[in-house]
A protein has these predicted regions:
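Histidine-rich, glycine-flanked metal-binding segment
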Residues: 1-49
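C-terminal cap of metal-dependent C-N hydrolases
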Residues: 11, 29-30, 329, 333-334, ...
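Metal-associated gating/positioning segment near the N- to mid-region
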Residues: 43-114
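Hydrophobic faces of well-ordered beta-strands that scaffold small-molecule active sites
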Residues: 51-55, 93-95, 129-133, 156-162, ...
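Metal-coordinating catalytic core of metallo-dependent amide/deamination hydrolases
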Residues: 100-229
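Active-site glycine- and acidic-residue-rich loops that bind
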Residues: 133-144, 229-232, 237, 245-247, ...
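Glycine-enriched alpha-helix->loop->beta-strand junction motifs that scaffold or abut catalytic
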Residues: 152-156, 238-245, 260-266, 290-294
């Protein structure tokens, strides 16, 4: 695929070690270049920023399973996802797919379809799509052969969840939303409850099984993360097993434990935009103010990373460079992607162009190729 060769002029560009500055930016051969090349495009009135790297997002579910039913052509759903990602300035996206006892669009069979669809379209899309597996730790019967399946699905990133309602199950009480969950999974409420009770009863077997699984995945070079750590002890347990990414820690104690040990801390950008967690967990704003955040992720809402970075800047909590790093260079570092996250010579030409007045996304490029362009800016490139 052909990348643009062009010099962008007249815009305010976020440059490393400089900050926002009126500067020319040349892209060619899919990278940011040191020397001018190609035709010059006047971008006066616009702001050019590094492309957004989204570490964790499951907002794609509505594209591939509208109205509770999977699309017949899953590939088309992934293409629709890419369009939304690009329209929100996202140039690298981790698509977080559940592998869960919840079944339906979060069940193992559906996960396999999603990963196959991502692999099928990966070579024909502009946005870099990275699959992530969110594995429910108490699915003990699914451990056998899981590393091999993950390798076959070309999944480089696995995160561990435990969403079992242990409190209710320990009290022999019916979990909330049981009937709705069961119907989505295609089970009777009685069968679904029995399955939950069985997994809860076998919880003592989970740590040993996870020891082996984490070791096997690490041997494959898989990046490992834990989801919703609630205590410092939980974070330490995961770290001891090579799980170095803490996604959405629920408490200050868990986040501080991660920072002290040098683990990566990922927070949800909707938490920033909302001004707090919708579940009553630790406030992302508070954690960011304390330096307990390496990256912000879209979580369930793709417009939120950009909005969160701009809100952090407007509030004065961070300058633009620091805020934007949480959605560009920060997440790139977590993923080990040293070729992106900053508009520097030799880096991938991943960038998002905003209208300087209202901060809306008007164009997105990944690897020097246009993934999104809308409105009057298109005329500037055409002419």
């Amino acid at each position: 695929m052909t990348a643009l060769e062009v010099t962008l002029s007249g815009a305010d560009v976020l440059l490393p070690d400089v900050g926002l500055s009126r500067a020319n930016l040349t892209i060619a051969d899919g990278q940011v270049q040191q020397d001018p090349a190609g035709p010059q495009v006047d971008l006066s009135g616009y702001t050019v920023l590094p492309g957004i790297v989204d570490l964790h997002g499951d907002g794609f579910e509505r594209h591939i399973a509208p109205r509770r039913g999977a699309m017949k052509q899953m590939d088309e759903g992934i293409l629709s996802v890419e369009a939304e990602l690009a329209a929100n300035g996202i140039t690298t996206a981790v698509l977080a797919q559940f592998y869960s006892w919840e079944g339906g669009v979060r069940g193992p069979a559906f996960a396999s379809q999603v990963f196959d669809a991502i692999a099928a379209v990966k070579g024909s899309v502009v946005t870099d799509l990275i699959p992530q597996l969110r594995f429910e730790t108490h699915m003990l019967d699914d451990y056998a052969g899981l590393p091999e399946r993950i390798a076959r699905w070309q999944v480089p990133y696995v995160v561990f969840n435990d969403h079992l309602p242990h409190g209710r199950l320990a009290q022999s009480r019916t979990p909330p939303r049981l009937t709705g969950q069961a119907l989505k999974a295609g089970r009777s409420p009685e069968t679904h409850l029995e399955m939950l009770q069985t997994m809860h009863a076998r919880r003592g077997e989970v740590p040993a099984a996870l020891e082996v699984l984490c070791s096997d995945l690490a041997d494959l070079g898989i990046r490992l993360g834990s989801h919703d750590d609630a205590t410092a002890e939980a974070r330490a347990w995961w770290r001891a097993r090579g799980v170095s990414v803490a996604e959405f820690p629920e408490t200050l104690d868990a986040a501080e434990a991660a920072r002290t040990a040098g683990d990566y801390i990922i927070l949800g950008s909707p938490n920033v935009v909302r001004g707090g967690s919708h579940k009553g967990n630790a406030s992302a704003l508070d954690l960011i103010a304390m330096g307990l955040c390496d990256a912000l992720a879209s979580d369930y809402h793709y417009p939120s990373p950009r909005r969160a970075a701009l809100m952090l800047t407007k509030s004065g909590l961070l300058d633009l460079a620091g805020a934007w790093a949480l959605i560009s260079s920060g997440p790139a570092k977590v993923l080990g992607l040293t070729d992106r996250g900053a508009l520097a010579p030799g880096k991938r030409a991943d960038l998002v162009i905003l209208n300087a007045e209202n901060h809306r996304v008007v164009a997105t490029m990944a690897g020097g190729r246009v993934s999104y362009m809308s409105g009057d800016i298109a005329a500037r490139f055409i002419t």
